[in-house]
């Protein structure tokens, strides 16, 4: 539900559209003339796909990429008219929906191509496809590393099927965000195989109209990598960097702004005396008089339980406040002894503040990546969109349901 009226200040994610624009422009400056396919899968990495896609469209994105048909249809219902690519699997029975909504889908095996073509013919149309080349990710795609010639033959067979229209070729780098010598060589080999596949298709009379291989790390590290490919047919496909985070600890650029700030409010303040405990398992016992604030959020909202017992840091009135005891499903406690002015209903920044954690520091503390932290913000958390400091939209999935 898109709204601009006040929302319940319980827990919410503020999405900075200015930062989103800045990040897109930073990628565009690096990519030069290469068109950009903005990746908005997983609800734009937790930021809200429709609102983010609208910004990318305004900024000149050429394509949008999602993971599944449902995400693509959501964008169409949200008024997005840009070409959309589904990067993953779509069951052949939904061929009619692909055709009706003008959605392109990944084609990654002979069996999938045949089933999709048959369903498209039965629906009275043709599905547009981008051939997915597996050059070393080992996920989905025509297996070029296993048997290059056989993979090309399968691609050409797919191109000839009556229910399919091949309009592109793509692949995905698996270690472009790792600058170790071995992985640099592996990425270069992936690129070499991809270029070889393009030219094999071209030689057989099936030259793809569009080719794309660069993810976030690829486009920033190797903007020259249309090398070996016709630049006028190439496109880059950035993801995490659009939302303000570098691809990895090894590959850092320093030019992106985090887009999401996760906030909640203080529900209660109390003084704990030595010997008193907080939260499940009695993992925190006060050793001295301690002022404790209870916050209206927990792991059901996407705040990781692994940040229990002092690992997490929340910001209140510009002061870093450590988490006390275990994070609960819907509530958590923090030490506000050093925040004398704290009051009930005051805002607390869970991540994205000046002295609080960031999605990146949380990822390090919980042995994961910022992608997972951002995507983990649950649907019950409203997304509040700000532009030049003003709230311009609110997305609240619970109210919509």
Question: Positions of the model-derived regions?
Answer:
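Fold-independent oxyanion-binding glycine-rich loops
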Residues: 40-42, 68-69, 89, 108-110, ...
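Residue-level signal for inorganic ion chemistry
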Residues: 20, 75, 169, 266, ...
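C-terminal accessory subdomain/extension
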Residues: 271-401
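Small-residue-enriched segments and motifs
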Residues: 264-266, 321-322
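A charged N-terminal "starter" segment
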Residues: 1-104, 110, 118, 126, ...
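Active-site loop/helix belt of alpha/beta enzymes
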Residues: 8, 42-59, 77, 114-119, ...
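Hydrophobic "anchor" residues on beta-strands that sit immediately upstream
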Residues: 37, 128-130, 168, 322
